[in-house]
């Protein structure tokens, strides 16, 4: 059983804070099981977006973990990411959007193995 989305987001933001990275909830989704998208602003007009990994990426040995995949391998213009997030919200109104700011692009997420 996975952590509720609101608890995971609170813990993730606390982790960012302890690493000296600013983070905030841009959009609250469903507290129980809303998908979480993480935008990492590089503070230069570019950003990275991390989306929930497909269910097939989950490890049976670690069922409580959340895994993410980068939407693109390279940073994208922030307006492109905002357009993508708007589409995600139209598709899934229960989704969460969390944004962090870090010039180095640190995200502190568990990435799915590809």
Regions found by a protein language model. Give the residues of each.
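Long, contiguous binding/interaction regions
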Residues: 1-20, 28, 53-57, 103-105, ...
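A generic local secondary-structure boundary/capping motif
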Residues: 13-14, 25-28, 85-89
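Short Pro/Gly-enriched beta-strand edge/turn motifs at strand-loop
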Residues: 18-23, 82
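Short, basic and Ser/Thr-rich N-terminal targeting/leader segments
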Residues: 19, 32-34, 91-94
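Short, well-structured hydrophobic secondary-structure segments
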Residues: 22-55
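Helix-rich interaction surfaces within compact, conserved domain-sized segments
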Residues: 53, 60-114
């Amino acid at each position: 059983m996975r952590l509720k989305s609101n608890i995971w987001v609170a813990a993730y933001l606390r982790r960012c804070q302890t690493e000296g990275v600013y983070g905030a909830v841009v959009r609250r989704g469903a507290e129980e099981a809303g998908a979480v998208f993480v935008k990492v602003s590089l503070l230069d007009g570019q950003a990275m977006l991390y989306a929930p990994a497909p269910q097939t990426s989950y490890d049976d040995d670690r069922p409580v973990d959340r895994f993410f995949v980068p939407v693109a391998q390279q940073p994208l213009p922030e307006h492109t990411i905002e357009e993508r997030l708007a589409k995600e919200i139209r598709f899934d109104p229960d989704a969460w959007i969390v944004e962090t700011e870090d010039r180095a692009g640190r995200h502190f997420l568990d990435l799915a193995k590809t």
